[in-house]
């Protein structure tokens, strides 16, 4: 954990459907920089998710259990409202490509309009995770491919179970 002069709570938001090793890498790196990390698992009702919000929260809790100072909370509605509720002034966002940057840049400006003083910190993935996304993992799993190298073991097991239920 960070030993900064001022304690700081940050939020790393996402749908995490499913959480990948890339997400976990960003969480671990964020954990090294900030005192308190809240993983905000978004309900995302407009997305056709593989896992329910409750399942995604439970999987994330299992995956980050080894990290003191990291908590997991589900939320619905606007991210800025969740940040306000959590009294967090910093959002952590992962950037894989310039397309991600353009999208996140637009969101950041909107966040600042809705919650003045909110800041976004952008982290790029380590090279081995640069291509990785939840969408890719779901597609590989649905088509019978091996996902063990892309997600934590508990997540791979949960995905396998979910895919088998749908068949």
From Swiss-Prot:
Family annotation (Gene3D superfamilies): HUPs
EC assignment: 2.7.7.3
Binding positions (ATP): 15-16, 23, 94-96, 104, 129-135
Class in the EC hierarchy, top level: transferase
Catalytic activity: (R)-4'-phosphopantetheine + ATP + H(+) = 3'-dephospho-CoA + diphosphate
UniProt keywords, alphabetically: ATP-binding, Coenzyme A biosynthesis, Cytoplasm, Magnesium, Nucleotide-binding, Nucleotidyltransferase, Transferase
Site keyed Transition state stabilizer: positions: 23
Cellular localization per UniProt: Cytoplasm
Chain positions recorded as substrate binding sites: 15, 47, 79, 93
CDD domains: PPAT
Any one of the GO BP annotations: coenzyme A biosynthetic process
Keyword Transferase listed: yes
Cofactor(s) listed: Mg(2+)
Gene Ontology CC terms: cytoplasm
Disulfide bonds: none
Molecular function as annotated in GO: ATP binding; pantetheine-phosphate adenylyltransferase activity
Pathway given in the UniProt record: Cofactor biosynthesis; coenzyme A biosynthesis; CoA from (R)-pantothenate: step 4/5
Record-linked PANTHER family: PHOSPHOPANTETHEINE ADENYLYLTRANSFERASE (PTHR21342:SF1)
Family note: Belongs to the bacterial CoaD family.
NCBIfam families, per database record: coaD_prev_kdtB, cyt_tran_rel
Subunit structure comment from the entry: Homohexamer.
Function of the protein: Reversibly transfers an adenylyl group from ATP to 4'-phosphopantetheine, yielding dephospho-CoA (dPCoA) and pyrophosphate.
Annotated protein name in UniProt: Phosphopantetheine adenylyltransferase
